[in-house]
């Protein structure tokens, strides 16, 4: 069914009413570019599972899903070399500067802090993501676990060119 579509509400100036009675899931999209800006924010098919949770309650607390668009971010090398340049065979690293993934992690930390400032308890804020968003979830929870209630990582993978180069299975 398409009942999940009825639960999507886009409000860029949102407030959280009764923040102590909410569970926040911050959802991070995947990516089809390694370190460059992207025109799309997310793929609708990714949202189905998370969107179905919006409005449900656990122990009287309502679930809210926050879609965190980070397509506009770009890493230092992405800006310089473009979509495929940094993954060419000649480039060996280490990464000079700040990567898009690092910026995604720090951007999520900022969003978490905004929810805490609104009054949502840290233990009721969960980071989630699919593909590169799942990888960002793992990286954030590894680095800042004390800032969130937990992480839900779906099919975490990113930078397939590197995996292919190093024969990761």
Each model region followed by its residue ranges:
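Short, surface-exposed "cap/lid" segments of acyl-processing enzymes
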Residues: 18-55
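Conserved alpha/beta-hydrolase
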Residues: 58-78, 83
